[in-house]
Design a protein with these regions (language model features):
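Short, charged low-complexity intrinsically disordered segments located at boundaries
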Residues: 42-51, 77-82, 166-167, 224
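Hydrophobic transmembrane alpha-helix bundles
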Residues: 61-72, 94-110, 180-192, 228
């Protein structure tokens, strides 16, 4: 697959960018948030996308745009993820946040179980047969194949399960059950990564949010103690 106006394939250009080997252009992916389609004029948005084919190479104009929302992007429809955390959002298309933490009380930990990495990425249900087939087709087309953990795979996952304040107190107090919970999340992530590695992707990614606008969400000392071993 080639980008119009360039000689390198998209895959080769990405590999060169990763290796700092003089790519023809900086690889990027630009999205319009799905909520935009019910907040702004759809024709104006489509005009914008149509005028930038480099940024939106697969754009096809539609009479009416009806986005497909993810399970935690639906207003007035709380979503319980595979870790039993309940997500809510105030606007269709905006990814929600966890409002009910499954282990807001440690008393439920004894019977708490991790989901199956063969059936979910931790946030949504998945079908590895479909993923496997899509990877196969992508490779046949010469595409750059990316695998990896979902966003918020460890620190944010623990925050969703326990709640931010309780998680921080657990780290300060050296709560023994926290170590067991971290191990549970780590084992799930490792199995998920192994499943992806079997498909031999070009790149693996591990996206996570660890900082705020002016600094980290936890001290470097706590990060080194609880998260460096996992990473």
């Amino acid at each position: 697959m080639q980008t119009i106006g360039f000689s390198l394939s998209q895959r080769e250009n990405k590999l060169r960018a990763i290796r700092f080997d003089y790519p023809e252009y900086i690889p990027m992916t630009l999205y319009l948030n799905k909520s935009c389609w019910h907040h702004y004029d759809q024709n104006a948005l489509q005009d914008l996308m149509e005028s930038h084919p480099f940024l939106f190479p697969n754009f096809k104009r539609q009479k009416v745009v009806r986005p497909e929302y993810l399970l935690n992007q639906l207003k007035d429809a709380p979503y319980t993820d595979p870790w039993k955390c309940v997500w809510e959002t105030m606007d269709d298309g905006i990814t929600g946040s966890v409002h009910q933490h499954q282990l807001g009380d440690w008393s439920a930990f004894e019977k708490y179980e991790a989901p199956d990495a063969n059936k979910t990425d931790g946030t949504y249900p998945i079908d590895w047969n479909i993923i496997r087939e899509n990877v196969k087709k992508g490779k046949a087309r010469g595409e750059f194949i990316t695998g990896g953990l979902p966003h918020g795979h460890t620190f944010l996952r623990l925050q969703d399960i326990r709640g931010y304040e309780d998680l921080i107190f657990d780290m300060i107090d050296e709560e023994p059950r926290l170590f067991k919970l971290i191990e549970m999340v780590e084992e799930f992530n490792c199995q998920y990564v192994k499943n992806w590695m079997e498909l031999k992707p070009d790149m693996m990614k591990y996206p996570e949010d660890l900082g705020m606008q002016v600094g980290p969400m936890i001290s470097p000392e706590l990060f080194r103690k609880y998260f460096t071993p996992v990473y």
